[in-house]
Structure formats: C-alpha cells, structure tokens
C-alpha cells in the first residue's frame, strides 16, 4: 500500500489538492484535523490564534496505526503530516503559493493579524518544505497559486512513486 502526505502552510491549497488527488488516484483521503479533534490529540486550544496546540508525538502514533492497518492507498492531509517518519511515507507533496494570493486566502478566512503574519512568514521561509526535507521525505513541490492541472500532477505522482 502507498501513503502520500500533503503538507504546506495553511491556505496553500493542501485540502483541495489532496481531495482531488484522492479521487483521481482512487486513494483514501485522511483528514488529520478531524482526527485531531475527534481523538483529542491536542494539549489545549489557543484562543488568541484560534487553533489547537497539537501533541505531534501522539498524532504520529495515531497516524502510524492508521497506515499500518490500512489495506488501501492513503492520502494524508495536514500541515503537520511531514512530521511522520519517512518509513511510513512514499511521497510528500508540499503545496506552495504566491505570498499575495496566500494573504488573500488567509484574509478570507478572517485570520487575526498575528496568525496571518505567522503563516505568511512560514510560507516565505519554506518551513514545511525544509522540515519535510530534514525528515528525509521524497518531496514533490506543487505551486497552487494558479489553476491546477490534476492530470499532470497525477502523472508526476505516478512517476515519482515508481522511482
């Protein structure tokens, strides 16, 4: 079974891409945010940033169990998915986005200034990409600034999974 993770700064198009790919590749879509909330894999809720503070170690244990028990190919969607150990992941897709477009997307979500700045900085500094590379993942970068050609992305993924 194959496992693809989709990571990137919030607002870069992870979920849209992951859901589209799960359909075209016939992979099972895993929504990590739902798992975090349903399984209460967080230490607290940060009121200021309006976000859960996630226990990444426990999240990885839950995701590893899902991967090991799965009889299907998986696409795991989360800005935290790149923390999974390399041995469980066949391909790591990192979504990137033009900073002006990302700012518009985050403003539509009504992010407060501090959270907005934090996410824009993370994108500018390539935090998710660098951390994915540090974790030795096989990385495919997808720019989601423009309309995506899912067929071309599917072909790229299939090629990468063969290598």
Tell me the role of every PLM-derived stretch:
Residues 28-84:
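ATP-dependent small-molecule kinase phosphotransfer cores
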Residues 12:
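ATP-binding Walker
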Residues 9:
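P-loop (Walker A) phosphate-binding loop of NTP-binding proteins
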Residues 103-104, 108, 133-163:
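NTP-dependent small-molecule kinase module
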Residues 44, 96-140:
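A glycine- and Lys/Arg-enriched "phosphate-lid" helix/loop adjacent to the NTP-binding pocket
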Residues 15:
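Walker A/P-loop
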Residues 6:
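Hydrophobic anchor at the beta1->P-loop junction of P-loop NTPases
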């Amino acid at each position: 079974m194959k496992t693809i993770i989709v990571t990137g700064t919030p607002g870069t198009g992870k979920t849209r891409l992951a859901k589209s790919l799960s359909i075209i590749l016939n992979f099972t879509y895993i929504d990590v945010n739902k798992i975090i909330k349903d399984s209460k894999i967080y230490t607290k809720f940060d009121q200021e940033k309006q976000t859960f503070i996630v226990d990444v170690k426990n999240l990885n244990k839950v995701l590893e169990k899902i991967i090991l028990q799965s009889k299907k190919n998986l696409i795991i969607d989360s800005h935290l998915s790149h923390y999974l150990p390399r041995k469980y992941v066949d391909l790591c897709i990192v979504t990137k986005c033009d900073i002006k477009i990302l700012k518009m997307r985050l403003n539509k979500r009504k992010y407060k200034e501090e959270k907005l700045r934090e996410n824009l900085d993370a994108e500018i500094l390539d935090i998710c990409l660098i951390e994915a590379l540090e974790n030795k993942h096989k990385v495919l970068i997808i720019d989601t600034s423009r309309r995506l050609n899912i067929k071309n992305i599917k072909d790229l993924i299939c090629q990468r999974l063969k290598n």
